[in-house]
Amino acid sequence: GAMNDLFLNTAVIISGHEKVVTRAYEEESQMLPNDLALLDVDQLIINLDKKYPDYFWSPRITFGGLLDIPDKNGETRDQGPVFAIGIDLLGDDSRMSEIWELDKNIVKGRLPQNFDEALISQRLANKLNVSIGDTATYIGTTMYNAFTTYNFPIVGTFDLHKGQADNQMMLVDISGARKALDMENAASEIF
């Protein structure tokens, strides 16, 4: 029982049950190399649905960087590293909230309702002294290795009860991740 839950929960965060990535991305996956991401993802998912109709396929973008929390004057109040995951939270047919059990894991606030809204782990919120309604600025690189900053309003905090796995985690809708990282119709992986 407990071991099955552990393996299932880890599979949800790390990969899903089956995963499609580029060979180059797989070789460098610990570096979160979105410059090696899948392209034309919409068509890839259509093809996967036809070939493997018993599976549920969904794109995901994993990315890391720095999360900057400004004060009332727009100056840095606090900042820290972030591991972020863009999943389909807003799609009509999406099951990501169900698969991730977000409804029962929300500590404060609500689920994102707009593409640019974010959930952060309760631990990260405590570390950065973030409140619901604050804006967090993601600082990182696009899939073309260009410098980027993107503002995500914080609408909720979560605790996935995964120990260190969700210690520095932020969850956003994949459309927000795509906009922040210049990854239109691209994804780190399909799972």
Language-model features: locations:
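Extracytoplasmic/periplasmic membrane-proximal domains and adjacent transmembrane bundles
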Residues: 188-190
